[in-house]
């Protein structure tokens, strides 16, 4: 996947970030990893770009019910309603893992496959 570069946008310039995202077609996340255990899958799409210095990622989620019980960062946010983003910057087998709950609690990691 190629990530579009849009230079000159600061992450704290909400209007510019929103305008950039508005010009990007959302891509669906049409994957249910454990359909036998969890047959319900929310509607999820994402948009992404980078500025050269920053990676900007926006998820849009429509979910029937939400859970937000984990209140600390680096807690078990995967047990709540959350989105996950994994990125490998090279072929070393290492990757970054970002998970964010619907209330903004984060789980961050750097792992090897």
Which residue stretches match the model-derived regions?
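Structural preference for beta-rich elements and adjacent junctions enriched in aromatics
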Residues: 1-113
């Amino acid at each position: 996947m190629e990530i579009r570069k849009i230079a000159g946008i600061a992450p704290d310039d909400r209007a510019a970030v929103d305008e950039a995202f508005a010009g990007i077609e959302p891509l669906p996340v049409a994957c249910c990893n454990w359909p036998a255990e969890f047959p319900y899958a929310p509607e999820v799409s994402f948009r992404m770009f980078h500025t050269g210095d920053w990676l900007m990622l926006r998820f849009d989620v429509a979910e029937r019910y939400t859970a937000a019980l984990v209140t600390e960062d680096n807690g078990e946010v995967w047990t709540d309603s959350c989105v996950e983003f994994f990125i490998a910057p090279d072929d070393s087998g290492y990757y970054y893992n970002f998970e964010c709950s619907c209330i903004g609690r984060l789980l961050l990691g750097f792992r090897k496959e």
